[in-house]
Amino acid sequence: MSSEQLASRGHTTAAQVRKDLSHFGSFGKRGLGYSIEELSVRLRAILGLDRVWQVVLVGAGRIGSALFEYPDFKMRGYDCVAIFDSDPEKIGTQWGTTTIHSSEWLEAVIEQLDVDLVILAVPASAAQEIADRAVEAGVRGILNFAPVQIKVPDSIPVEDVNLVMQLEALSFKITRGGAGE
């Protein structure tokens, strides 16, 4: 497949495709294009999608429930191995075959199951404490749905998901009259 064909599928330019891929090594052959199978394997490895990631979910409220039910996580290699909450009425109940545990067991489970990622779906008031505990237990990254910025060591990547800010960005783009800005 040529860089032009890849570019048209990604709504970008052929030059941008070649430039982006060059950051990760040599791909394809001049005049022949790219082997899609080889490109797929190499990109999956670069993105860390060639393995299963152990994930715990902290927060069994509405956002946590929606995230847990999302089928693409499992299909893409994200295995939710445990759920935690502080609500006594939720502790001990099950979502599918997964039991909701007391958040006091967070560190032990992270260490025991060698958890890679934590999804925080907790109130702002609990986010920093949970993040600190998860980092101390050895987690390697955090997806933060709490409406607050958390502070962790620079070695721990954090992705903040703020739905209100994303809606504001979308409404700004619509107000400005451009979808591609």
Model-derived regions, located:
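HTH-adjacent hinge/linker in prokaryotic transcriptional regulators
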Residues: E4, R9-V55
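Phosphate-bearing ligand-interacting subdomains
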Residues: E4, T93, T97-E181
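Alpha-helix termination/capping residues and helix-transition junctions
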Residues: L49, M75-G77, Q112, E136
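Short active-site oxyanion
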Residues: Q54, C80, D116-V118
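Glycine-rich Rossmann-fold phosphate-binding loop(s) that bind the pyrophosphate
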Residues: A60
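Hydrophobic/small residue at the entry helix of a nucleotide-binding pocket
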Residues: I63
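NAD(P)-binding Rossmann-fold cofactor-contacting core
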Residues: K74-T98
